[in-house]
Design a protein with these regions (language model features):
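Conformationally flexible catalytic loops at phosphate/diphosphate-handling active centers
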Residues: 128, 144, 156, 160-211, ...
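Glycine-rich phosphate/diphosphate-binding loops that line cofactor/substrate pockets in enzymes
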Residues: 19-30, 72-78, 102, 160-164, ...
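Phosphate/pyrophosphate-binding active-site segments
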Residues: 2-12, 148, 184-186, 299-397, ...
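Glycine-rich, anion-gripping cofactor-binding loops and their flanking helix/strand elements
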Residues: 75, 221-303, 401, 410-442, ...
Length: 558
């Protein structure tokens, strides 16, 4: 199946296609290959094992977990994650994670196996033309038809995945060509891309801010992804503008900061005369870009700032917009704002801070609730004080994770992962694996709804085999809570919304080699969490919660 390798020239790399692909991945900062064993991609494993030093191979129990781990690696490290999936069902099992990466702007490269080119059309095992399946949910999807295409094609893939606007890239290589050899220039680390904003656009936004009496800034995931968190905090503090954070923007303005008004979100967005949205789409999470305007009031003017032109909203009515490297954008904008008028906004900030304090006081009762069955908020009343500043908290669920979004305020950026706007359950175990590898000394906490737990809990086996301690907390209300309440409201009944009562998920983890316990008394949540953090093993705390204590929401989020 292999050919004699061509003779390398100085500065060239030679070897089979798997070796070449691994070399490119390493040049782009990849440290771990996430995979589930498949013969179509054996050369990738050989390339990883024989690299100097070897590349870490992290094998899982379901390809979705490998792809979700690569997606989360992209979020956490801000360099593309790598998943290697065998042909056919291996690739299709990873499609949901690829779609999540596309929606969230997560840099990742997925390398798929492919049936041999020299038998294509003859009915080889798992013969499937995969790029058309993935094309609609990726930045780029293509086949690298020969071993000689791998160096350049993989470099293009990683460059595209890691460039604004970030996202997933898929390539597959025919099995026969994966084993063939080629030579080409040795890969080098790419230079970072920094696109400056249009100075006229910067000036226009600065003028709007200077005219505003009640501005609000929203900081989203792309601020973190673009490594602009320091510039964003500098902008908020120097300009004195209240801020709301979402997605991986959480923690950029740390919890308890006087200008963080996420707990006064409704008042801030309904009362603002200017909303500057930076690094997040104007989607269902932000009212599709319409703020205020109730009872005949004038809606807020809206500014959208993005990392690339394709991310600027086309459906919302915008007063201004700009795009570019977000550090450059924010620093340029701050310089213009400082040169312009600075209205006294102390009353606006004071009102929002008062609401934050009142909300915090009101939440205290829920966080300490002694209700039986347990109110899910009580879990966060016990968990939040136990989180270190560098903790990574992962949400995989519906109602239970909605409570987390309300009560968990990261002390630092890069410490919160959720599925993002795609809303895909089952991402949690992959994200937990990625977080433990990316942050080996940090607390890693995976928050699971009991519905979400059913998607991926078998990959606790992966945590155990690879000695990756993670604390898992299940909010177990024996229902699909995000569907049960709305269906009852619409129809007066619900179907297909109940799960088996009080399922012993802790026993699943024990059977796979981890540890865990069930909690039915709110006073035992804290001690159970202490045991979990001290255990040094994958540990699941299964908290039986009240199905009627649903997260209050104004819309279905669609």
């Amino acid at each position: 199946m292999s050919e004699s390798p061509p003779s390398p020239t100085p500065g060239e790399l030679t070897g089979h296609a798997g070796k070449l692909a691994v070399a490119v991945a390493r040049a782009h900062g990849v440290e771990t290959m996430f995979t589930l064993s498949g013969a179509h991609v054996f050369p990738m494993y050989d390339g990883a094992v024989k690299a100097d030093p070897p590349m870490r191979l992290l094998d899982v129990r379901h390809e979705q977990t490998a792809a979700f781990a690569a997606e989360a690696t992209g979020k956490l490290t801000r360099t593309p994650g790598l998943a290697v999936l065998t042909a056919g069902p291996g690739v299709t099992n990873g499609v949901s994670a690829i779609a999540q990466a596309q929606f969230a702007g997560s840099p990742m490269v997925v390398v798929g196996g492919r049936a041999p080119q020299n038998r294509w059309g003859s009915g080889s095992l798992q013969e499937l033309d995969q790029p058309p399946i993935v094309a609609s949910v990726s930045k780029l999807a293509r086949t690298l038809p020969t071993a000689g295409d791998v160096l350049g094609g993989m470099d293009e893939a990683f460059t595209a995945a890691g460039s604004s606007h970030r996202g997933p890239v898929f390539v597959d290589v025919p099995m026969d060509e994966f084993f063939n050899t080629a030579a080409g220039p040795a890969p080098t680390a790419p230079a970072p891309e920094r696109v400056a904003p249009d100075p006229e656009a910067v000036g226009a936004v600065a003028r709007l801010i200077g005219e505003s009496a009640r501005p609000v800034v929203i900081l989203g995931t792309d601020v973190w992804a673009d490594r602009a968190e320091e510039a964003a905090l500098r902008f908020v503090e120097t300009a004195g503008i209240p801020a709301i954070t979402n997605g991986m923007g959480r923690g950029i303005v740390p919890g308890r900061h006087p200008l963080l008004v996420t707990k006064a979100r409704g008042q801030a967005l309904n009362g603002a005369d200017l909303v500057v949205v930076i690094g997040t789409p104007l989607d269902f999470r932000l009212g599709y870009g319409v703020f205020g305007g109730k009872d005949g009031a004038t809606p807020a003017r809206v500014v959208h700032v993005a990392d690339s032109p394709g991310q600027v909203s086309t459906h919302a009515s915008l007063a201004a917009s700009m795009h570019g490297d977000l550090t450059t954008v924010l620093d340029s904008l701050l310089a213009e704002v400082e040169r312009g008028p600075r209205p006294d906004r102390s009353g606006w900030v004071d009102d929002l801070q008062a609401t934050v304090r009142a909300t915090t006081e009101r939440d205290a009762a829920l966080l300490s609730a002694e209700a039986d069955p347990i109110h899910p908020a009580r879990i966060y009343g016990e968990l939040v004080p136990r989180l270190a500043d560098d903790a990574v908290v992962i949400g995989d669920g519906g109602d239970f994770v909605s409570f987390a979004g309300k009560f968990v305020e990261p002390a630092r950026p890069g410490g919160w992962l959720d599925p993002g706007p795609y809303g895909c359950l089952g991402a949690g175990l992959g994200a937990a694996i990625a977080a433990r590898l990316a942050r080996p000394s940090a607390q890693v906490v995976l928050l699971l709804g009991d519905g979400a737990a059913g998607f991926s809990l078998m990959d606790v086996d992966t945590l155990v085999r690879h000695r990756l301690p993670v604390v898992m907390v299940v909010g177990n209300n024996s229902a699909w809570g995000l569907e049960k309440g709305p269906m009852q409201m619409l129809y007066g009944y619900d179907v297909a919304a109940d799960l088996a009562p009080a399922t012993a998920y802790e026993d699943v983890v024990k059977a796979l080699g981890g540890a865990g316990e069930r909690v039915t008394d709110p006073r035992q949540i804290g001690p159970a969490l202490d045991r979990a953090f001290a255990s040094g093993v994958p540990y699941l705390v299964n908290v039986i919660t009240d199905v009627d204590a649903a997260y209050p929401r104004a819309t279905f989020g669609v």
